[in-house]
Curated annotation (Swiss-Prot):
InterPro entries: Cation/H_exchanger_TM, Na+/solute_symporter_sf. This is Probable Na(+)/H(+) antiporter 3. It is a multi-pass membrane protein. It is found in: Cell membrane. The keyword Nucleus does not apply. Its main location: membrane. The chain crosses the membrane at residues 2-22, 27-47, 53-73, 81-101, 102-122, 146-166, 175-195, 215-235, 263-283, 294-314, 325-345, 354-374. Belongs to the monovalent cation:proton antiporter 1 (CPA1) transporter (TC 2.A.36) family. Gene3D superfamilies: 1.20.1530.20. GO terms for biological process: proton transmembrane transport; sodium ion transport.
């Protein structure tokens, strides 16, 4: 077993060096860290193993990322752009979801297995979308707000649908009760946390450490309560972020976010989340598929349905071709939700190993390639503006 000093030296070296090296090639930081994870992980050079400590740190990184995503959502802009976000989310949910279900039927997965395919086709990756928008400084823009809000709405619905699929897969009969509990859970968080936070954060106005402690405290309360109901921790973390954001003034928001939480999250925990994602990815499955037709059908249809639905929705909303393209591409990446869905589907016997491997390949390709393409388009757009 490696010394933890050695492990953390390797991790910090990657986090510090690799993104700066690959930045010259317009490769986003999250992609470069994931690629590094694939190379050093057990399916690559086997330099590091993913142990329980790294898994815990990665899980906390995902929680921090989702909380910061919620905290970054400008609630006033969200209210102004809710209708537009809803249009994008409906296109991005229904078209790929229906397409995924039909392809599942074509592949002979049955009703529940096809529902699982619908979840996988419809799912976004809030983590990757938010990280790309953050890196490109687009979170606060109108396009960024619409895309992030729509991604969140879609992921909430797909997580709920995944929960329903799990209930059906294990023969559950309380799906309606679960959905009611989930709605109540989200409602209570959005109503209770803002008023509570205004009072408590006001008491600790000049005590920054205590403010951070309070934020972490409510995040974990929300997660623990959510787990009792059966709600994924990232949902609770995101809702907490939105609720806390509602309680803050702009100055408090910038101070809490930029001076404290961003440093904690992006300085350590969030990069570990992406590094571990790469380390746990067996890239060889892409090259070892016995049925290439299955991979091509799934990959081409999933990417095409997502991109087309996003492009059309943003065109309806009046954006130009470049922004439609960027927005359409940002609906494509799949990683956490799709891999969780695939893993659960295999455990429940809803899909076989061949389908599972295909979904892993889909997740790896979309999560790795999409950020690179988006950043290249964004840089090209900026260069064109500079020349003009």
């Amino acid at each position: 077993m490696e010394s933890y000093y050695y492990v953390f030296f390797i991790i910090l070296s990657i986090i510090f060096i690799v993104p700066n090296l690959l930045k010259k090639f317009n490769i986003p930081a999250i992609t470069s860290i994931m690629i590094a994870g694939i190379i050093i992980g057990p399916y690559g050079l086997n330099i590091l193993q993913v142990d329980e400590t790294l898994k815990i740190l990665a899980d906390f990184g995902a929680i921090m990322l989702m909380f910061l995503a919620g905290l970054e959502v400008d609630n006033e802009t969200l209210k102004q752009e809710f209708k537009n976000s809803l249009i994008l989310s409906l296109f991005s949910l229904l078209i790929p979801g229906v397409g995924g279900y039909l392809i599942g039927q074509y592949l002979g997965l049955g009703f529940i297995g096809s529902l699982l395919y619908a979840v996988i086709f419809a799912s976004h990756s809030v983590a990757i979308v938010y990280a790309i928008l953050e890196e490109l400084k687009m979170v606060k823009t109108r396009l960024g707000t619409i895309i992030l809000s729509a991604t969140i709405i879609v992921d909430l619905f797909t997580l709920l649908l995944l929960s329903v699929v799990i209930k059906l897969g294990i023969g559950g009969e309380n799906v309606g009760t679960f959905l009611l509990e989930t709605v109540l859970y989200i409602g209570v968080l959005l109503l209770a946390i803002p008023s509570l936070s205004k009072n408590i954060l006001g008491v600790f106005e000049k005590l920054h450490a205590q403010r951070i402690h309070y934020v972490l405290f409510i995040i974990f309360i929300a997660i623990i309560v959510g787990e009792v109901i059966g709600i994924h921790p990232i949902v609770g973390a995101f809702i907490c972020g939105v609720a806390v954001s509602e309680a803050l003034t702009k100055e408090e928001h910038d101070e809490l976010l930029n001076k404290n939480l961003n440093a904690i999250g992006y300085g350590f925990f969030i990069p570990i989340f992406f590094l571990v994602l790469g380390m746990e990815t067996n890239i060889r499955v892409i090259f070892n598929l016995s049925n290439l037709e299955l991979l091509l059908i799934t990959l081409i249809s999933a990417v095409a349905l997502k991109f087309i639905s996003g492009f059309i929705a943003l065109r309806i909303l009046g954006f130009d071709r470049i922004k439609n393209t960027i927005g359409g591409l940002l609906t494509v990446p799949k990683i956490s939700a799709s891999l969780v869905a695939a893993s659960i589907g295999r455990e429940l016997g809803l899909i076989g190993n061949e389908i599972f491997v295909t979904i892993v390949a889909l997740s790896v390709i979309t999560a790795t390639i999409t950020p690179i393409v988006v950043k290249h388009i964004f840089v090209a757009k900026c260069n064109k503006k500079a020349k003009n």
